Amino acid sequence: RPPRSTQSRSSAASDVYKRQVSAFCRVPAYVLVPKGKGPFPAVVALHDHGAHFSIGKEKVVRPFDEKPEVLEDAARWAQTLYGGRFIGDELAKRGYVVFAMDALFWGDRGRREGVDYQAQQQLAANLLQLGMTWAGIVTWDDIRSAEFVASLPEVDPTRIGAVGLSMGCHRAWMLCAASDRVAAGAAICWMATTPSLMRPGNNQTKGQSAYAVLVPDLRNWLDYADVAAIACPKPMLFFNGEKDALFPVDGVKDAYARMHRVWSSQRVEDRLVTKLWPVAHVFNEEMQAEAFAWMDRHLR
């Protein structure tokens, strides 16, 4: 495991929390720190996919020290998927240290390494030949993010959570399953069974950026819900939308049932929350209020 090396590039302050841009392992990140005396609980805020690569961390934290076009891009995205809010900023206002970085091919890492599907598939293919995966790199980066957050003097390392929408949801439950650093996770709009996602026309069948969440041979042993259930007995929250065309409701319900069986088998059924909302593929203000209140109960 390589040693951690960080450098603060810039910072800004608000009435509630201070913000800084950190660079570690040559990857820019946002860190939001509440004002007041810590240590504080923390959240790793994991951005979505959205087939929109010009921004990454800026989808979950209001950008600063950026060009006007980045600010406008982020504001439009927040309005489209997050009810006009930046979830990282909302969590910082609630007293959390918030960490957000770009996944490979998004934001600063997209502008530098290419944002087109051909480049993504080319890298994914080359990684497979090296015995690695794009999804594995994303998850490893998120694990290291949690390790970094735990090392911050402002953070209580026993109270770290993860939250994300869409691909950020996939990243959240993967991180909770893979890292003992993360104590709880809120995973929004990325959970179903593999058969339900392999229907003609679904994004999972198109290749392209699907490689960001695909692990070869995994399906021979585990489905997505089984991987997420490795997080048991941690508190976990899963929301999906009944009108979400990407995740068929029957597949979502089957996946939820698989996870409930695991938490129930460990006599911690009360630590798993699953809910279908009458919405599409979004994390709106009402959903945020319920998810953040749940996180407060387990991390504050």
Each predicted region: which residue ranges?
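Cap/lid segment of the alpha/beta-hydrolase catalytic domain
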Residues: H47-W140, A150-S151, S196-P200
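C-terminal catalytic histidine-bearing segment of alpha/beta-hydrolase fold enzymes
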Residues: A257-R300
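Alpha/beta-hydrolase fold nucleophile elbow
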Residues: V155-G164
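Gly/Ala-rich beta-loop-alpha elbow adjacent to hydrolase catalytic centers
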Residues: G164-G168, A172
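Single conserved hydrophobic/aromatic residue that forms the stacking wall/gate
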Residues: P2-A13, Y17
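Mobile cap/lid helix-loop segments that gate and shape the active-site cleft of serine hydrolases
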Residues: Q122, N126-Q129, I137, R144, ...
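Short beta-strand/loop motif that positions the catalytic acidic residue
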Residues: A231, F238-N240
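Short beta-strand element of the alpha/beta-hydrolase
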Residues: A29, P39-H49
